[in-house]
Amino acid sequence: NVPAFVLEYLLANTCSTDDEDKIREGIENVKNVLRERYVNPEESTLIQSKLKEHGKYKIIDKISVELDPQRDCYWANIVNSNIKKANISDQLVRSHEKLLLGGIWAIIDMEYDPMITVGSKVYPFLVNDIKPIQLSNFNMERIAEKRKGFSKEEWKKLLLRSAGYEPDSEGLDERIQDLLLLRLIPLVEANFNMVELGPRSSGKSYIYKEVTPYALLMSGGQGTVAKLFVNNTTGRVGSVGEWDAICFDESTDHLFKDSDAVPLMKDYMESGSFSRGGKGGEISGNASIIYNGNINQPVETVLQNSHLFSPMSSEVNNDTAFLDRINAYLPGWEIKKFAPSNFTTHFGFSTDFFSELLKGLRKDTYYEVVDEFFSLGSHLKQRDAKSVRRIVSGYIKLLHPDGNFTKEDVEEYLKIALEMRRRVKEQLKRIGGMEFWDTNFSYIDKETQEEIFVSLPEEKSSALIENVPLAPGVCYSATGDGDHVGIIRIEVVVVPGNGKITITGTTSNAIKEDVKNTVNYIKANEK
């Protein structure tokens, strides 16, 4: 259960060599350090006892700091060690401001001194020094400057390798790379809601578990109102106010312990805020919400029998009001199970640096950039347009942190965004019928006034019938001879003539007679 960035830090400090013997020796040292210094939550009492017995002890743990204005001092909280209100100097807090922003993982020099009192209370735990394992400061301006030295493709590969993927490996083509980047958008866009359903072992939860300490991976059925939103007794805001992203793993099982969590989640997914009786009133949060799960059937089979939300928990899988708040449906079935060759051995950003980069990008926004070059089609309603803009914004943040991009870049991301939101809308149409009839998503180039429609790869019918509005005089129908059924395309055009009917395209007298009878019927009844 050791976070990846903790391992990276220790390995980098002991195994930075090409000498195989020294690497093996370094790995053994890392194992010893973790065994002696890394704190598992169940060992908290033992660690406190060691501090008392030895007077001083060095640990690897997550530390956060809060200000106590009544006493005009700072208190440190050591998470896994379950140490509350440890003494810490103002200078240490000033040197590491992220201690006040949710905390950081660090190597912590602790001391136990039973003579330290505040008023009549004893506060024996003291933080003497910390050596951050995560970055305690981060400069986004340097990222923007360094980005200029990379092409777009080079930067994309760097991002993917930093996340652990090898973009040049078999099976990770351009399409899959774009989908893997989409997994990062909830980490750079606040209050972004996404669903990914797909096969097992395709890394759906990996990003949120291993790549960033700012995401919470929640097992199915563990979500409670107090844990997610607010504790009415204490007034403490829950996970939506503490994390950048919350990923519900195995969302095909039960999602929430409390039945009233669903309406609260609807409110939160819509506006980023919620209200609940008791303390707090209207409460806001910034956490993005991700629902991951497995599909146990081919997607074609699911679409034949139901809809693509059907594998999700029965709490929400037919709730159109809930599902309409999903910004993007990532087609996880396109991402196959990863082989060892799909994981990179090349250089990328260290995990702590990469997680800070993703967190820093949340402050930017490119929400309006679509309007510089394109208009959205008439079928996109408010929630559709909002979702599409946020997906485009996320891709620009990831691939163009310096803010330099072209119209072609925006169009590329816009097509992906329209597809991801259209997939949501198509399932809503299957569930809710004509309330969600407007699914022909398109965009209009402001320069050429050309309208481009975006379809879904899994909708096989698009190969037979155009997935765009048909031209006047064109329609499709089904016909059969009793044994076979086929699709026919009918085109009607008006051309100058002499008023006589001419039938072409068939030698069947029966068909010709049927057409003549139809024409005569229309003439007789047209008035």
Q: Model-flagged regions — what are they?
A:
Residues 151, 155, 257, 261, ...:
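Helical mechanochemical/support elements of P-loop NTPase systems and associated helical scaffolds
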Residues 166-301, 306-310, 321-324, 444-458:
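Conserved ASCE/P-loop NTPase catalytic core
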Residues 249-250, 291-293, 330-332, 491-496, ...:
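Flexible glycine-/small-residue-rich
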Residues 1-166:
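Extended, charged/polar low-complexity intrinsically disordered regions
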Residues 162-166, 268-272, 295, 329-333, ...:
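Conserved, well-folded catalytic cores of nucleic-acid-processing
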Residues 456-527:
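Conserved P-loop NTPase/AAA+ ATPase motor core
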Residues 281-289, 294-399:
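Phosphate-sensing "switch" segment of ASCE/P-loop ATPases
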Residues 340-342, 368-443, 450-467:
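C-terminal helical "lid" subdomain and adjoining coupling/linker elements of P-loop NTPases
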